[in-house]
């Protein structure tokens, strides 16, 4: 279910949300409730009916602070399971020290990491076209696939995400550029 798009998030109560989810359970294996940003009424509605929370954050200080606050609220509300997805990771910035690494974010938030998604223009293109990125042969498509499999209970090592990123390509590009520069006598 998508997050409410109206300003009035109070039109549905937490009890109504619980009833709605109970009505949907016989029809679906998974019911995903998209939560609005922030911790207002819409957030409280979503967690009232949830059996599991997946916190999605980016490796930016303000986003991590918000995620930490959300995790604290989920803990206080006795959420049975809290997982983490780190989105919009830019390895070039991580290498320069301008962005926190996956390990840094995961260590700070101390919840189960189920996936990472690199910052990828294919996601924007796919979204603008109204086409799903999951299931495509792009890196981000694979990352979404791995996350979905983990949500479904498949025990995939997070190394699969790293392998899908093909981090070694960074070194190859660099080597090619060095070779190109050397061959041009620069």
Question: Where do the PLM segments sit?
Answer:
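P-loop/Walker-type NTP enzyme "switch/lid" segment
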Residues: 1-26, 125-129, 134
């Amino acid at each position: 279910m998508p997050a409410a798009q109206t300003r009035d998030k109070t039109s549905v109560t937490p009890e109504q949300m619980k009833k709605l989810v109970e009505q949907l359970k016989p029809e679906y294996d998974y019911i995903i409730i998209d939560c609005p940003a922030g911790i207002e009424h819409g957030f409280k509605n979503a967690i009232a009916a949830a059996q599991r929370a997946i916190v999605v954050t980016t490796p930016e200080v303000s986003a991590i602070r918000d995620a930490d606050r959300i995790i604290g609220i989920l803990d206080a509300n006795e959420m049975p399971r809290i997982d983490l997805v780190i989105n919009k990771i830019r390895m070039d910035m991580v290498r320069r020290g301008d962005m926190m690494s996956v390990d840094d974010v995961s260590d700070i938030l101390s919840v189960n990491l189920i996936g990472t998604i690199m910052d990828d223009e294919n996601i924007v293109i796919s979204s603008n076209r109204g086409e799903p990125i999951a299931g495509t042969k792009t890196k981000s498509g694979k990352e979404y696939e791995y996350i979905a499999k983990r949500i479904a209970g498949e025990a995939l090592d997070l190394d699969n995400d790293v392998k899908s990123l093909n981090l070694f390509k960074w070194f190859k590009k660099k080597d090619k550029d060095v070779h190109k520069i050397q061959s041009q006598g620069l």
